[in-house]
A protein has these predicted regions:
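Rossmann-like S-adenosyl-L-methionine
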Residues: 1-169
């Protein structure tokens, strides 16, 4: 929550949102949160979690982040008659989010997703990663374009778990 720098007026996209844990937490301090997840049951759970907790400022979409976000962005640009050149002068709630949070699988973010995030040009991107190699790869892309790494914090996401595998025959 601290990394997102929310004050209550921000519009946030949460990509790879799962059951909405981060989305619903962020909704406490955001104007609106939009979550995207590929697993339909996870989105149903996110919607149920929002309802159970009386959260009304979170919306959830089923699909791959690398498909949903670009499709939404292109459709919204047409609807709002915004071009890439003029889009940076003003924000619209969903088209120009203040913050994008990503918590991708180990493979990291898809290139199309990263490109769309860059086009949407949020003030902040919060990247949660379970793979340091794909984190480094994706940060390189984001930082080469327009962002600067301001804060980072390492923590063990999988307590007492080791990412090694043993194969036996």
């Amino acid at each position: 929550l601290a990394f997102a720098g929310l004050t209550g007026n921000e519009n946030v996209w949460d990509l790879y949102c799962g059951i909405g844990t981060i989305s619903l937490f962020l909704s406490q301090k955001a104007k609106q949160v939009y979550g995207v997840e590929i697993v339909p049951q996870a989105i149903e759970d996110a919607k149920n979690n929002a309802k159970l907790n009386g959260i009304t400022n979170a919306q959830f979409f089923v699909g791959k982040a690398e498909e949903v976000l670009p499709q939404f962005y292109e459709n919204a640009k047409k609807t709002e008659k915004i071009t890439d050149d003029t889009a940076s002068t003003g924000r619209t709630d969903m088209l120009r989010p203040d913050v994008i949070v990503v918590d991708p699988p180990r493979k990291g973010c898809d290139e199309k997703c990263l490109d769309t995030m860059l086009a949407m040009s949020p003030e902040r991107i919060v990247y949660v990663s379970c793979d340091s190699a794909t984190l480094a790869r994706d940060l390189k892309i984001l930082c080469e374009e327009k962002y600067e790494l301001m804060k980072w914090q390492a923590f063990d996401q999988f307590r007492e778990a080791h990412p090694q595998a043993q194969l036996q025959r």
